[in-house]
């Protein structure tokens, strides 16, 4: 979720909490693999249930599972499907991230059995399912407010719950959600128990953790260790960009910084040197096993900052190719991109424009080709399993060539990106096949048997 700090409120509110509790030790020891074997070359697809179909239900979405599997989707990430709070609700339907009960399903979306059926069919089709988890805050009418008021942050006068705050204690503009107090005895264990409930009752394969950097890192270490000890190597994605979260057990983090670089290049505000600078910094900053979720859109970007076309013009596909070619890349597709999504989904109401699923769109072919390349070519695998990346930039033409894999290796992938008005000076790779040709980008790969 996006956070906009209300500076004016910061001076008016002083935060106090219970006496700090000692960090909860992992409830079990886990010495198994951190990353599931199936995550080696996986991609991720974000599911916005409310806006995906005219019905806006889990059952209606389920009919799309065979198509998504055929397209090559590996991981389905469901935005929160729990009930949405009524108190201080924004808009008619409210924010998905204002949850009133962690262990229930939003009746507007369907039932627990509906979701269980989706997970079962997704597994049969070879896909995995992860659920969005909102650990930083709840709705103001969450069941914990009455049952465990001590779980919430209080103001100087002892009032609770209060609006969610940032890491400096400043109130956000998320006026529909209440801040949780991670120093409260018993609160961490309750959160982990509710996460485990979903794994045990629905057989999901992991979590995408909302605004993970606003939650104590030692909690994540405890939670991930405990959940893996009882459920095996779950896949966990952080909506944040901090190496400490990889050390705490996350498999992947957001590539927010690179996303903003792509936006700026598309707008002509930066050139390709920004890509090289970003890549060089990452070589020293991130653990080798890091997976970065790169994207040209997601639910936040689409609703609040504009469509791919609004932000990137005709370079949207080129930017997706760029995201997929980067070292550590773990590329995202957002709901409807393969159907040519070109309008902003409203965040707190039902979309009235809709997605046209009646006929295949050319974007579906593009994404199918890109996902197939990642599956077939180890040069493009995730984390340290993928091959090393080399860059060659030409600022005069605002072009860059990216190669994954060393010369002489059996498997290589190469891409040339041209973001200027004239052609790049780079030579077309020899003994490789041209497999992707879109505005601003071309991709070649080794001829494999």
Where are these regions (language model features)?
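Bacterial N-terminal signal peptides
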Residues: 7-14
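Active-site-proximal helices and loops of the catalytic beta/alpha 8
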Residues: 25-28, 32, 120, 194-196, ...
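Substrate-binding/active-site clefts of carbohydrate-active enzymes
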Residues: 29-45, 50-59, 63-74, 80-202, ...
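Hydrophobic faces of well-ordered beta-strands that scaffold small-molecule active sites
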Residues: 43-45, 76-78, 129-131, 207, ...
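Conserved, mostly hydrophobic/aromatic
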Residues: 47, 68, 78, 102, ...
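Short, solvent-exposed turn/loop segments enriched in Gly/Ser/Thr/Pro and often Arg
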Residues: 77-90, 132-141, 210-216, 239-244, ...
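Active-site clefts of carbohydrate-active enzymes
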Residues: 287-311
